[in-house]
A protein has these predicted regions:
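Bacterial N-terminal signal peptides that target proteins for export
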Residues: 1-10
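Hydrophobic h-region of N-terminal signal peptides that target proteins for export
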Residues: 13-22
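Residue-level micro-sites within transmembrane alpha helices that shape
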Residues: 6-7, 18, 131
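Carbohydrate-interacting regions of secretory-pathway proteins
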Residues: 21-248
């Protein structure tokens, strides 16, 4: 895509690869409102080797997440994708393994609802591991469900959310799980996330796929899986989506 919007991408590859910290899930029950909340802070063009997943004009690289035979039905206008409520999640036609992802998103400028009912969506790495998208600007909710959380597992290190309606960025380094020939897990998934240029997930090890109010075990999936975006029935917008495949 030649006419992408937004701030110039901050080069993250070496920095993210160097992150080796591990966060503890801690003693709190999942989605506990008593869990300490993160501190609130004030928070270009793709590389030549990137695969541009949204060209600003159509959804030719996307399909319905539930069926490869169904098209993606979200709205496209003014260089962005907007969730069309009740049409279902969308997924990339191309499959990806370990990767670097850049994606920009914005929740509705008009504030409606509270908690999880305000600008909710999600970015699913390998179709199963959710980075939460939410309007988390002056909007209390459980820590492991706010924007930039690994939903149901890790809160972000800080709340770097911008105001509703403003464009925000996620820059992600993803290393998916690995299994041996018998299907036994040999390497859990790890992820590093920058929200608006701020480190919020520091090479965390995931306990398994995302699920609501439970933590299911890993399943023996292929190394390469689609990237998916969530229809949570809110008109969240996405743009400037690109990915770089990393050596396994």
């Amino acid at each position: 895509m030649r006419t992408l919007h937004g701030r110039k991408f901050l080069v993250l590859g070496l920095l993210a690869a160097a992150q080796a910290g591990a966060q503890d899930l801690g003693p709190w029950p999942q989605h506990s409102m008593d869990r300490p909340k993160p501190a609130i802070i004030d928070p270009g063009p793709p590389p030549s080797d990137a695969i541009v997943l949204f060209n600003g004009h159509d959804l030719s690289n996307w399909r319905n997440a539930d069926s490869a035979d169904k098209p993606a039905l979200w709205k496209v206008e003014n260089g962005y994708i907007e969730v069309a409520p009740h049409t279902g999640n969308i997924a990339t036609k191309q499959l990806f393994g370990d990767c670097q992802l850049h994606i920009e998103w914005a929740t509705p400028a008009k504030v409606e609802g509270e908690g999880q009912e305000r600008g909710n969506s999600g970015v699913f790495m390998a179709g199963k591991y959710e980075i939460q998208v939410l309007d988390s600007y002056d909007n209390p909710t459980y820590a492991d469900g706010q924007a930039a959380s690994m939903f149901g597992q890790y809160p972000p290190l800080v709340n770097a959310s911008r105001k509703p309606g403003e464009w925000q960025t996620y820059d992600v380094i993803w290393h998916g799980p690995r299994f041996d020939a018998s299907g036994k897990l040999t390497r859990p998934a790890r992820i590093t996330v920058f929200h608006n240029g701020i480190l919020v997930q520091d090479n965390v090890t995931l306990s398994g796929p995302t699920a609501f109010k439970k933590r299911p075990p890993y399943t023996n999936d292929p190394v390469k899986m689609p990237l998916a975006l969530q229809d949570h029935e809110f008109p969240v917008r996405f743009r400037n989506i690109w990915i770089r495949e990393l050596a396994n």
